[in-house]
Regions:
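Bacterial N-terminal signal peptides
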Residues: 7-17
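Beta-strand elements of well-folded, non-transmembrane domains
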Residues: 43, 112-114, 129-131
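Short beta-strand edge/turn micro-motifs at domain boundaries
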Residues: 122-153
Length: 154
């Protein structure tokens, strides 16, 4: 009887752990769900979730120049982003240009909004995402110069 109770508790705690993982499982679904997971993590400035988003190394292409980063922390500087009046970003449109089991190329239109939900910037970007294991990762982003993210942009 005690053994059955312990097995039951194991299942309860196991499923509770999965439920608490929440959006983490979004990394394992479609490219679109992964991108929403990334935007949610970015908007929340959630370092733990952002750690799960980026491939290592990660590359950015801007104005014909390719820059490699060993961590998203080298790439994203939220103080630079906030100087534009940014409060959050929203996805306006996505188009899957290429999709396979382990790689996708996505064209995305997005907006940066201020605290009153006014658009402070709007841009088109291209992202290459890869799935080296069970989770999608952002491997490369092509982002216009008009969207500051890093120290290099300020």
């Amino acid at each position: 009887m005690m053994r059955k109770f312990l097995i039951f508790l194991g299942f309860v705690f196991g499923f509770t752990g999965l439920a608490l993982a929440g959006g983490h499982l979004e990394n394992e679904k479609t490219p679109e769900k992964f991108l929403q997971y990334y935007f949610d993590a970015f908007n929340a400035q959630d370092a733990k979730k952002l750690d799960t988003v980026f491939a290592k190394p990660f590359q950015r292409i801007r104005n014909g120049e390719t820059i490699s980063y060993t961590s998203w922390r080298e790439y994203i500087n939220f103080e630079v982003v906030k100087k534009t009046g940014w409060k959050r970003s929203v996805i306006n449109e996505t188009e899957i240009v290429y999709d396979s089991d382990k790689t996708a190329v996505v064209r995305i239109l997005f907006s940066r909004l201020d605290a009153s939900d006014n658009i402070v910037a709007k841009a088109e970007a291209a992202m290459i995402i890869v799935k080296p294991g069970s989770q999608w990762k952002l491997a490369t982003i092509l982002l216009p110069e008009s969207i500051p993210v890093s120290e290099e942009d300020s």
